[in-house]
A protein has these predicted regions:
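Flexible, active-site-adjacent loop/turn segments at secondary-structure boundaries
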Residues: 80, 144, 149, 199-200, ...
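Cell-envelope/extracellular polymer assembly enzymes that use nucleotide-activated donors
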Residues: 73
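ATP-binding/phosphotransfer module of carbohydrate and carboxylate kinases, centering on a glycine-rich
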Residues: 1-70, 94-97, 117-122, 166-333
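Phosphate-binding/catalytic loop of phosphoryl-transfer enzymes
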Residues: 82-183, 328-332
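Glycine-rich beta-strand-to-loop/alpha-helix junction loops that act as flexible
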Residues: 76-82, 128-130, 258-268
C-alpha cells in the first residue's frame, strides 16, 4: 500500500505575469521535482503564449522528478486571468493539446494561494501584490473569486501607493496634517516640491506605475508612527476586512469557523503594519476567525489542493510537504 501511495503523482501549475511554476508531488506529500518558465497572462498575451510557458515549466518539472505525463494522476493549474465562465475549459484544452495529461483541474491563481497557507479544504484568501484578488472555498468545494468585484482603489500595492501619493497632495493643500510621506515621494520623483511631484503624477503614466515599488517604505513610515500614513493603513485594512466579510456572507460561510489566508508581497511579515491591522479588524468582527500568512509558494498550494481533490489528507503529509518544500526553496519565512 505504501508503495502504491508513493507512486501516485500530482502536478501543480502556477502561472502569473511574473513567472510560470510547475511542481510534482508524490502521493506521500514529498515534492520530487519543480521547474520555472517565463510568466504569461493569457488575456493579454494569448492562450498560445501562456500554454507554451506552461508546457516548458511542466516538462522541466517532470524531468526533474523523473516521471512522465502518464504517471500524473491529477493536474491542478492555478492560472492568472481565469476570471470568466469558460476560461478554465480554454486553459484545460490548451494543456491537453500540448501534454498527454489525464485529469486536469483549472482555477484562478488566487484559489491555489489559499492552499499555500493552510491544509484545510475551505476558507478565504486575499492576495495583495501589485494588484489584489481573493477567493473563498466552502465546505462543498464551491468557489467564489472576487476578480473585478474588487474596485480599483483596492488593487493592492498599486492602489496603496496611489492613495499614499494623494495623502501627500492633501497635506500640501491642508486637507490633512503634514506627513513623512511627502519626503518619501519627493525623493522617489527627484523633484524639489509637491507642485512638481503633482505634475509628474498627473502627466507621466510610467511614473505612476513605478510608485508601487514604494510600498515597503510606505509601510515603514506608518510603522514609525506617522499619523497620516497610519490612518491610510487603517483605512486600507478596513476595506480589506469589508471584502472578506462580504465574501463570507455571499458564500453563506461562518467566518468564526474559517481560516483567512493573507498572500502576496504587500502582506509580507506578521509585523507588517497592514497585516497587523487586517488581523485586528478581523478579530474585532469575528472572534473565532483565524488569520494567517502563506507558508509556501503557490505552486505547492496547487499540489496540496490536488491531495484534497484526491481525498488524500494533507495534514497526514505535513512533515513531508514542509521538508521537501524547504529543500527546494518553496517555503516562505
Amino acid at each position: 500500500m505504501k508503495k502504491e501511495m508513493q507512486e501516485r503523482y500530482i502536478l501543480g501549475i502556477d502561472q502569473g505575469g511574473t513567472k510560470t511554476a510547475a511542481a510534482v508531488m508524490r502521493g506521500d506529500g514529498f515534492i520530487v521535482g519543480q521547474a520555472l518558465a517565463r510568466g504569461a497572462y493569457f488575456p493579454n498575451e494569448g492562450m498560445e503564449s501562456a500554454a507554451a510557458a506552461m508546457q516548458e515549466a511542466v516538462e522541466g518539472a517532470l524531468k526533474s522528478a523523473a516521471v512522465d505525463c502518464e504517471d500524473i494522476e491529477l493536474t491542478v493549474a492555478g492560472i492568472g486571468g481565469v476570471d470568466w465562465p469558460g476560461d478554465d475549459a480554454a486553459v484545460k484544452g490548451a494543456l491537453q493539446e500540448r501534454l498527454s495529461l489525464g485529469e486536469i483541474f483549472v482555477c484562478n491563481d488566487a484559489v491555489i494561494a489559499f492552499y499555500s497557507g493552510t491544509l484545510r479544504s475551505h476558507g478565504a484568501v486575499i492576495c495583495a501584490g501589485t494588484g489584489m484578488n481573493g477567493a473563498l472555498i466552502d465546505r462543498e468545494g464551491r468557489q467564489f473569486v472576487y476578480g473585478d468585484y474588487m474596485e480599483e482603489k483596492a488593487q493592492g500595492g498599486s492602489a496603496l501607493a496611489r492613495r499614499a501619493a494623494r495623502k501627500v497632495f492633501d497635506a500640501e493643500l491642508g486637507l490633512c496634517p503634514p506627513t513623512k510621506l511627502t519626503q518619501l515621494f519627493l525623493g522617489q520623483a527627484e523633484v524639489p516640491d509637491v507642485d512638481t511631484l503633482l505634475k509628474r503624477y498627473m502627466t507621466e503614466d510610467a511614473f505612476r506605475k513605478e510608485l508601487r515599488f514604494l510600498v515597503p517604505q510606505i509601510l515603514m513610515v506608518a510603522e514609525s508612527g506617522d499619523a497620516v500614513a497610519c490612518g491610510l493603513i487603517v483605512e486600507f485594512a478596513e476595506e480589506i476586512a469589508d471584502y472578506i466579510e462580504a465574501g463570507f456572507r455571499k458564500m453563506k460561510m461562518n467566518p468564526e469557523e474559517e481560516e483567512v489566508v493573507l498572500a502576496g508581497s504587500v502582506f509580507k511579515g506578521m509585523e507588517n503594519p497592514l497585516t497587523k491591522q487586517v488581523v485586528k479588524r478581523m478579530g474585532e468582527r469575528f472572534a473565532g476567525a483565524k488569520v494567517m500568512q502563506v507558508h509556501y509558494e503557490p505552486v505547492v498550494g496547487a499540489c496540496i489542493m490536488g491531495l484534497i481533490r484526491l481525498q488524500m489528507e494533507p495534514s497526514e503529509r505535513e512533515k513531508a510537504i514542509r521538508e521537501s518544500a524547504s529543500v527546494l526553496g518553496l517555503c516562505y519565512g
